[in-house]
Regions:
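Intrinsically disordered, low-complexity regulatory regions of eukaryotic transcription factors
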Residues: 1-46
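Active-site neighborhood segments
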Residues: 32, 36, 40, 45-246, ...
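Conserved, non-catalytic sequence blocks in retroelement Pol enzymes and Pol-derived host proteins
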Residues: 33-36, 99-102, 131-135, 161-163, ...
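Extended serine/threonine- and charged-residue-rich low-complexity intrinsically disordered regions
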Residues: 99, 237, 251-254, 262, ...
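Metal-ion-coordinating, acidic/His-rich active-site neighborhoods
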Residues: 170-174, 191-337
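Short, hydrophobic/aliphatic alpha-helical segments
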Residues: 183, 279-282, 628-643
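Short amphipathic alpha-helical "interface-anchor" segments enriched in bulky aromatics
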Residues: 295-305, 311, 633-662
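Polyampholytic, low-complexity intrinsically disordered segments
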Residues: 550-567, 571, 609, 661-696
C-alpha cells in the first residue's frame, strides 16, 4: 500500500524546494522523452526512498500530476518567452514547415528568429500545432496569424522563411494583410525568404534524378509499398550507375546474413566502418519522403567509393551461388566506367553537401546560417557548376543522343556552347519575355567572364570556402577515361543541376534583402557585389541591389528616424522659441521635416556605403557599437542579420518530436506534444530554466 502523501503545509521540506523538484521531474520527462508515468515505476520509487523517504511522500509523482505540472510550466514559461520577444532588438522573423506525425496528424512548426537584448541571435519554437483542413495558402495563413496573435507579435512580424512551394507564396499574401494593412504585394514578396536548404535540395535532386525528381522518388516508394521489388530494381537501374549502386546497397542490407557476409569480406571490426548508407525514411516506414534523401544518396556514393574494393569482392564471392536470387543481378554490377562516373558525381555534389552542412546552423560567429551566406553560397556553387560545364563542354548533341539514361532532361544548345565557359547565368527577369526560352540568345549575351571573388570574403570565412571541397574539374575529373555515353550522362546531370540553381538564383532578385545582407555586412559592403558582378549585363544587378536596399530602407525605417529626429526637434523648439506663435513654429517644423526627408534616412545609408570595408568578425556587434552614428540603419541591419538562411529548425524539431511519439505513445494529443516540444526547445536553447530555488 502506497503511503498517503502529506499536505504541503505539514511538510518539513520548503515549498520552494518541492516546486523546484516538480519542475526538475517535468524537465527530465520532457528532455529524455520518457513516459509521464516513469516515476510510478516501483524500482525507481524504491531507489528514491533510499535517499529521502520524506521527499517521496511529499512530491506528487503520478503521471496525471506530471501532466498537470507540464501544463502549469508551459503557461508560466511561455510568459518568459513572450517577455524575451518584447525586449528583442529586432523584428520577429518566422519560419514554418509542415509534417505528418507518426500518429497521422498534420503538424505545423513555427519558429521565431530574432536578436535578443544581449545582441545574441535566438531561435524559439512558438508552436507545434495541429493543422486542420487543406494545406492551402489561406488555411496556412490563418494558422500563422493566430499563432502571431497568441504570442502578441502581430505588429512586429518581419520576414518569413519557408520552402519553395507555391502554397507558401499564397500563404504570405493572406498572412501579412491582417497584420499590416499597408502591405503591398511587392512588400510581401520582399519579405518572402526562400529556404536555402530547400534550394540546395532541389538542385542536388535535379542533378541526381533529372527534372522530375519528385515523380521518380514517389514511384520508387509506391513500388516498395506494393512489394514490387523487381519493378523497383528496374526503376532505379534506369538511372545508371547511381541506380545500380542503390540496388547493390539494398541487396546487401536486405538481410542480416548478407550484411554479416559483407562485414567479413570487408574485415571491419566496427559497424560504422562498413555501413554503406543511413536508412532513408522510406525504408523505415510507409510515409512520404521528407525531401532530404539526396543527402543519403551522396553519403552512399561517398562511402561506396571508399569501400569499392570490398564491394567488388562481395560481388565476386557471390558469383559461385547456384541460386540466382542469392546473386546480385548482372545488370546491376558496376563496371570500371560506372565507378568513374560515381567519382565524378561525388566530386560535383560535395560542395552542395558541405554548403548544406555549413548553413543549417544558428549563426555562429560571422557565418553558419546567416542570410548573407545564401547569395554568396549560390555564387560559389554557380561557379562550381560552370567549371564542370566548361570542362564537359566538348560533349556534342550527337554524343548526348548516345546516352542510355534518356529520362534525364536533354541538354539544350545554349548550354553546350563553350565560347563563354565562365559566364554567370543572366537572371531571367532581365530578359525580354520573348527570349525567356531562347537558350542560344541567353548564351550570346554572356560576353564577359564573371568569377566568384574569394579575395573579398572575410579572412575567417575565406579559408572555409576555399577548402569546402570545390576543386577545379580539370584536377580531379576522370572524363577522358569515360566512354561517350557516360560523359553524356554526366553532362546532362550537370545541366539539370545548373538550370535548377540558375532558376532560384534569379528568384533571389525578388527580394532586396539577400543582397542587403551582403551590403550591410561591414566586412563586405557594396564592394563585394561590385567585385563579383563584373560582366556588362551584371552591372544592372548592382544598381538594382543598391536601389532595392534604399527603397526598402526608406519605406520601412523612415518612421523610426522621424520619431527620433522630430522628438529632438520639438524639444529644441520648445527650449528656443518659448511662447512664440504656433503658426511660426509649425512653419519651421514643416521646412525642417522636408529637409530631413530629402536627406534623412538615405543619408545614413549613403554615409555607410562610402565607408571602407571594416575589419570585424561580428557584424551584429559592429552595428551595436555604431548605433549612434547610424540610428535607423543599424536597426535595419540588425533586422536583416536576425533572418536565418534556412528553415532547418523546423526539420530538427520534427525529428525530435518523432523521438517523443514512439510506438507506445501514439495516443499523445497534439496539445501535449506541443507543450513537450516547446519546453524542450526553450530549455535546451537557454530561453528558460527549470528547478531554480534559493537553496539550489
Amino acid at each position: 500500500m502506497t503511503p498517503k502523501r502529506r499536505r504541503l503545509e505539514q511538510s518539513v521540506i520548503p515549498k520552494a524546494k518541492v516546486r523546484a523538484i516538480q519542475e526538475l521531474s517535468v524537465g527530465f520527462v520532457v528532455d529524455s522523452d520518457v513516459p509521464f508515468t516513469i516515476f510510478e515505476h516501483s524500482f525507481l520509487r524504491s531507489l528514491f526512498n533510499q535517499f529521502d523517504h520524506e521527499l517521496m511522500l511529499q512530491i506528487p509523482w503520478s503521471g496525471s500530476s506530471i501532466a498537470r505540472e507540464l501544463q502549469r510550466l508551459f503557461d508560466t514559461k511561455r510568459d518568459v518567452i513572450k517577455a524575451e520577444l518584447r525586449d528583442a532588438l529586432t523584428t520577429i522573423h518566422l519560419s514554418f514547415d509542415l509534417w505528418t506525425s507518426p500518429n497521422r496528424f498534420a503538424i505545423m512548426a513555427v519558429f521565431a528568429h530574432f536578436i535578443d537584448r544581449g545582441a545574441r541571435q535566438q531561435s524559439r519554437l512558438l508552436a507545434l500545432r495541429r493543422q486542420f483542413g487543406t494545406h492551402s495558402g489561406e488555411n496556412l495563413a490563418a494558422s500563422l496569424v493566430g499563432i502571431a496573435q497568441d504570442w502578441e507579435i502581430g505588429g512586429r512580424v518581419g520576414c518569413v522563411v519557408s520552402d519553395n512551394l507555391a502554397a507558401n507564396d499564397h500563404c504570405l499574401q493572406y498572412m501579412y494583410k491582417p497584420l499590416d494593412s499597408s502591405m503591398r504585394p511587392a512588400d510581401i514578396k520582399a519579405r518572402r525568404m526562400r529556404c536555402y536548404g530547400h534550394i540546395l535540395n532541389l538542385v542536388a535532386r535535379a542533378f541526381l534524378f533529372g527534372k522530375d525528381a519528385e515523380s521518380f522518388e514517389l514511384e520508387s516508394e509506391i513500388n516498395c509499398m506494393r512489394g514490387l521489388a523487381e519493378q523497383d530494381l528496374s526503376h532505379w537501374r534506369a538511372k545508371g550507375p547511381i541506380g545500380k549502386l542503390h540496388n547493390i546497397v539494398k541487396f546487401i542490407r536486405s538481410s542480416p546474413q548478407r550484411s554479416e557476409h559483407f562485414k567479413r569480406i570487408a574485415q571491419e571490426e566496427e559497424y560504422e566502418e562498413y555501413r554503406l548508407c543511413e536508412e532513408s525514411t522510406a525504408e523505415l516506414e510507409v510515409i512520404l519522403n521528407n525531401e532530404t534523401r539526396w543527402n543519403s544518396t551522396y553519403m552512399m556514393i561517398e562511402r561506396a567509393l571508399r569501400k569499392r574494393t570490398d564491394i567488388r569482392a562481395f560481388i565476386f564471392a557471390l558469383e559461385g551461388e547456384q541460386d540466382e536470387a542469392k546473386r546480385i543481378p548482372a545488370d546491376d554490377i558496376l563496371s570500371n566506367e560506372d565507378w568513374r562516373v560515381l567519382g565524378e558525381v561525388n566530386a560535383i555534389l560535395k560542395p552542395i553537401y558541405l554548403q548544406t552542412m555549413r548553413t543549417q546552423g544558428w549563426g555562429k560567429a560571422d557565418g553558419h546560417g546567416r542570410l548573407w551566406e545564401v547569395l554568396v553560397g549560390m555564387e560559389y556553387l554557380l561557379e562550381h557548376f560552370e567549371d564542370w560545364k566548361a570542362f564537359y563542354g566538348d560533349v556534342t548533341t550527337q554524343t548526348m543522343s548516345l546516352a542510355s539514361f534518356v529520362d534525364l532532361e536533354p541538354v539544350d544548345a545554349g548550354f553546350i556552347r563553350t565560347d563563354s565557359p565562365g559566364g554567370r547565368p543572366d537572371r531571367a527577369r532581365r530578359l525580354p519575355a520573348r527570349f525567356d526560352d531562347d537558350e542560344v540568345y541567353v548564351a550570346r549575351q554572356r560576353t564577359q567572364t564573371s568569377r566568384f571573388t574569394e579575395s573579398v570574403l572575410p579572412e575567417h570565412s575565406r579559408t572555409e570556402y576555399l577548402t569546402m571541397g570545390k576543386s577545379p574539374a580539370s584536377e580531379i575529373s576522370q572524363k577522358n577515361t569515360l566512354p561517350a555515353d557516360h560523359r553524356g550522362f554526366i553532362r546532362t546531370s550537370i545541366n539539370n543541376g545548373w538550370k535548377k540553381l540558375d532558376e532560384y538564383y534569379s528568384k533571389l532578385g525578388e527580394s532586396p534583402l539577400f543582397a542587403a545582407a551582403i551590403i550591410l555586412h561591414p566586412r563586405f559592403g557594396l564592394g563585394w557585389l561590385e567585385a563579383t558582378w563584373v560582366a556588362e549585363e551584371q552591372l544592372a544587378w548592382v544598381r538594382d541591389a543598391k536601389a532595392g536596399i534604399k527603397d526598402y530602407f526608406s519605406r520601412w525605417y523612415s518612421r523610426e528616424r522621424e520619431r527620433h529626429e522630430e522628438t529632438g526637434l520639438d524639444n529644441s523648439a520648445r527650449r528656443t522659441m518659448g511662447q512664440e506663435d504656433d503658426q511660426y513654429t509649425q512653419w519651421i517644423n514643416s521646412k525642417t521635416k522636408k529637409a530631413l526627408e530629402m536627406g534623412g534616412n538615405n543619408s545614413e545609408l549613403d554615409r555607410y556605403l562610402r565607408l571602407e570595408p571594416q575589419d570585424t568578425q561580428d557584424p551584429i556587434q559592429w552595428w551595436r557599437e555604431h548605433t549612434s552614428s547610424f540610428p535607423s540603419l543599424s536597426s535595419f541591419a540588425l533586422d536583416v542579420f536576425a533572418i536565418p538562411a534556412m528553415a532547418s529548425d523546423c526539420e530538427r524539431q520534427f525529428s525530435l518530436a518523432k523521438l517523443t511519439l514512439t510506438s507506445q505513445r501514439l495516443s499523445m494529443s497534439a496539445d501535449t506534444l506541443e507543450r513537450v516540444q516547446c519546453l524542450k526547445n526553450w530549455v535546451r536553447h537557454g530561453g528558460v530554466k527549470l528547478g531554480n530555488w534559493p537553496g539550489s
